[in-house]
Amino acid sequence: MDEAESFVPFQGIKKDVKGRLNCYKQDWISGLRAGFRILAPTTYIFFASAIPVITFGEQLERDTDGKITAVQTLVSTALCGVIHSIIGGQPLLILGVAEPTVIMYTFMFNFAKSRTDLGSNLFLAWTGWVCLWTGLLLFLLAVLGACTFINRFTRLAGELFGILIAMLFMQEAIRGIVDEFGVPGRTNPRSAEFQPAWVFANGMFGLVLSSGLLYTGLKSRKARSWRFGAEWLRGFIADYGVPVMVVVWTCISYIPWKSVPQGIPRRLVSPNPWSPGAYQNWTVIKEMVDVPVLYILLAVVPASMIAVLYYFDHSVASQLAQQEDFNLRKPPAYHYDLFLLGFLTILCGLIGIPPSNGVIPQSPMHTKSLATLNHQLLRNKLVAAARKCIRNNATIGEVYGSMEEAYQQMQSPLIHQEPSRIQGLKQSHIQKASNADALVDETVFDIETEVENILPVEVKEQRVSNFLQAMMVAGCVAAMPLIKRIPSSVLWGYFAYMAIESLPGNQFWERIVLLFTAPSRRFKVLEDNHAVFIETVPFKTMAMFTLFQTAYLLVCFGITWVPVAGVLFPLMIMFLVPVRQYVLPNFFKGAHLQDLDAAEYEEAPAILSFNLKPEGEVSRATSFADSGEVMDGMFTRSRGEIRKVSSLKLGGGGSGSTVGSPAGGGVELMRRVVSFQNPRVSEKVYIRSLSDFRGGGEISPRSSAGRAPFSPRSATGGGGGEQRLSNLGKSV
């Protein structure tokens, strides 16, 4: 959208509504056609959404003297989630009560409690006015097209914000575990479970439960690569392992039930939804008229802070859920979603519950899970079509043609949408292959690997999963008696799990790890797929950029500890936009900044000379056991991006043969196919040997058997391709 056009009142909202209305019917049909398979991403995102909300509710219950509990946070998440899934613009966006909202409500409660003419009794009524002002400010921002500025956020800001959220989650987990060793407030310290010995026992048992959930949860996500168990069992554990582990460790907490006091381990504390104290907030609108006029006007101050906070969090969460790398085919709706958020904020304030907004990392996690689902459906269809064609002695051109036909059969053409990335594959690439008329030998033509190379990453864009997960959160309100049986330490373990799970794939985190890696071991980075900047940016420059980003991160994290003002830490993230645009170019070369702050997550392949596997063996080693595992390898987990990886099949001479590619022309075919998905691949030239990397004549014993050329420019066997040396070991 043009910036001048975006500031025309209502222009952005009208464009968003028009674009999404054309897709609305298909949003529901697409989800329903997925059948029971939609339950896997639904359950996955439900637990990622519900467990933090329950924990935040318990935190609010302590900080507001019971005025707000887990019942209210669950109701807010469910209500806003259902409304957004039905009439929202971007259905991939997940709404929920977030940590900044908890901090802000704690501040407002302490302020109200300290004022005799307001007091804790009018706290919810005053927050109703705060939410009313917040909603009006969000309306104003949406009408004026303020969301246009979100597009200026680069990887620098996004990854720093992702690490900051991970730090806040880990901080909450550590704080919760430490509290397990103390006596909670508003309890009888003379009770048996609060005696020093039992308090220590509660803390140690809680440490076991939280660590157990963290360890088993991380392991279960990699179940598809296990060597043991049937494929369906490994897939089930990978999809549902974390919620299953919550149940398992909850059951373990009941083992010593005869030998310990009843309160060990400690469990969630929240009233049932039918308890007298749980529904007093629903009539808070009647008490709003009792708030003094002065405090109604003063409510603009916290409302402005919350509006800025929601504008940033909601828009960035939506941006991360619909990145370009996800290849979404339907238009965004930033302005309309912000406008709808204003309505939801007012609604929540009028019924006395904390408002919900777009949350990170749940939103990109939702998109990633739907990409995995769509990938499984497409992959199975294309593999079946290819095998059927091969059994009929088809040529390679006919095989690819049948796969494209199968692909198009699964697509649902829409009006006003981006075209599919695979459209025209047969005409643009297959007919250019020199051996397109050659018969296919299934013993050397790896169908599944070929499908993985040509199948673009696409997301099953629909509203069903968001609607179902919101309804499941609503079901948690009625299931509160069961939820209260979960040990609080298990939830702290889940917080730590979400923090750690968000780190891999974050280039900022990878550079931090690289800084602490011994210089003699840094070459190990090149033995696996790695970010392209490792080869293009000098190590000294990389270190300076990382140290700047780390210092900025610590400043942002320190601000979160400042009373009241701590909630405005997103302003520091927003300040990175002018810093990146006007300040950093004075200290770093433009080419280096481009690689370190790239819009896409691009990786270079591992270097074959680091191991002695034949090319065919390495090619097969890079394939995955099943479709779900493929997406585990392709996705980063911090921002949910797609890793752009140069195919190993690009190497090798034009006269040789590779696994998955018929001799000679197959290499050229795959070069064109991969180039089609990522045009930048053809512009990258990678180092060939360990001696190149080290910049000297020293060669690893593992590289003595020969070197495989990796330059896509020499993929056809020609020489003369430019060779670029790695800069990882260089200081300038």
UniProtKB/Swiss-Prot annotation:
<keyword id="KW-0039">Anion exchange</keyword>
<keyword id="KW-0813">Transport</keyword>
<dbReference type="InterPro" id="IPR003020">
    <property type="entry name" value="HCO3_transpt_euk"/>
</dbReference>
<feature type="transmembrane region" description="Helical">
    <location>
        <begin position="124"/>
        <end position="144"/>
    </location>
</feature>
<feature type="transmembrane region" description="Helical">
    <location>
        <begin position="464"/>
        <end position="484"/>
    </location>
</feature>
<feature type="transmembrane region" description="Helical">
    <location>
        <begin position="38"/>
        <end position="58"/>
    </location>
</feature>
<feature type="transmembrane region" description="Helical">
    <location>
        <begin position="198"/>
        <end position="218"/>
    </location>
</feature>
<feature type="modified residue" description="N-acetylmethionine">
    <location>
        <position position="1"/>
    </location>
</feature>
<dbReference type="GO" id="GO:0005452">
    <property type="term" value="F:solute:inorganic anion antiporter activity"/>
</dbReference>
<dbReference type="InterPro" id="IPR011531">
    <property type="entry name" value="HCO3_transpt-like_TM_dom"/>
</dbReference>
<keyword id="KW-0472">Membrane</keyword>
<dbReference type="GO" id="GO:0005886">
    <property type="term" value="C:plasma membrane"/>
</dbReference>
<feature type="topological domain" description="Extracellular">
    <location>
        <begin position="313"/>
        <end position="339"/>
    </location>
</feature>
<feature type="transmembrane region" description="Helical">
    <location>
        <begin position="78"/>
        <end position="98"/>
    </location>
</feature>
<keyword id="KW-0007">Acetylation</keyword>
<feature type="transmembrane region" description="Helical">
    <location>
        <begin position="235"/>
        <end position="255"/>
    </location>
</feature>
<feature type="transmembrane region" description="Helical">
    <location>
        <begin position="557"/>
        <end position="577"/>
    </location>
</feature>
<feature type="transmembrane region" description="Helical">
    <location>
        <begin position="292"/>
        <end position="312"/>
    </location>
</feature>
<feature type="topological domain" description="Extracellular">
    <location>
        <begin position="219"/>
        <end position="234"/>
    </location>
</feature>
<feature type="transmembrane region" description="Helical">
    <location>
        <begin position="340"/>
        <end position="360"/>
    </location>
</feature>
<feature type="topological domain" description="Cytoplasmic">
    <location>
        <begin position="256"/>
        <end position="291"/>
    </location>
</feature>
<comment type="similarity">
    <text>Belongs to the anion exchanger (TC 2.A.31.3) family.</text>
</comment>
<feature type="transmembrane region" description="Helical">
    <location>
        <begin position="158"/>
        <end position="178"/>
    </location>
</feature>
<feature type="region of interest" description="Disordered">
    <location>
        <begin position="695"/>
        <end position="732"/>
    </location>
</feature>
<keyword id="KW-0812">Transmembrane</keyword>
<feature type="topological domain" description="Cytoplasmic">
    <location>
        <begin position="179"/>
        <end position="197"/>
    </location>
</feature>
<protein>
    <recommendedName>
        <fullName>Probable boron transporter 3</fullName>
    </recommendedName>
</protein>
<feature type="topological domain" description="Extracellular">
    <location>
        <begin position="145"/>
        <end position="157"/>
    </location>
</feature>
<feature type="topological domain" description="Cytoplasmic">
    <location>
        <begin position="578"/>
        <end position="732"/>
    </location>
</feature>
<feature type="topological domain" description="Cytoplasmic">
    <location>
        <begin position="99"/>
        <end position="123"/>
    </location>
</feature>
<keyword id="KW-0406">Ion transport</keyword>
<feature type="topological domain" description="Extracellular">
    <location>
        <begin position="485"/>
        <end position="556"/>
    </location>
</feature>
<comment type="function">
    <text>Probable boron transporter. Boron is essential for maintaining the integrity of plants cell walls.</text>
</comment>
<dbReference type="Pfam" id="PF00955">
    <property type="entry name" value="HCO3_cotransp"/>
</dbReference>
<feature type="topological domain" description="Cytoplasmic">
    <location>
        <begin position="361"/>
        <end position="463"/>
    </location>
</feature>
<dbReference type="GO" id="GO:0006820">
    <property type="term" value="P:monoatomic anion transport"/>
</dbReference>
<feature type="topological domain" description="Cytoplasmic">
    <location>
        <begin position="1"/>
        <end position="37"/>
    </location>
</feature>
<feature type="topological domain" description="Extracellular">
    <location>
        <begin position="59"/>
        <end position="77"/>
    </location>
</feature>
<keyword id="KW-1133">Transmembrane helix</keyword>
